[in-house]
Amino acid sequence: RGSNLTIHPLRNIRDIFYVGNITIG
């Protein structure tokens, strides 16, 4: 996942936001 962070940073941030949404909701 480290390489993914460098290649697709927006995708990684979106994934974190998605997980955070599930945790909050």
UniProtKB/Swiss-Prot annotation:
Residues linked to a glycan: N4, N21
Biological processes annotated in GO: proteolysis
Cellular component annotations (GO), alphabetically ordered: extracellular region
Highest taxon above the source species: Eukaryota
Location relative to the cell: Secreted, Extracellular space
EC nos: 3.4.23.-
EC supergroup of this enzyme: hydrolase
Keywords: Aspartyl protease, Glycoprotein, Hydrolase, Protease, Secreted
Coiled coil, from the record: none
Modifications made to the protein after synthesis: N-glycosylated.
Tissue: Placental cotyledons.
GO molecular function: aspartic-type endopeptidase activity
Family indicated by similarity: Belongs to the peptidase A1 family.
UniProt-recorded name of the protein: Pregnancy-associated glycoprotein 74
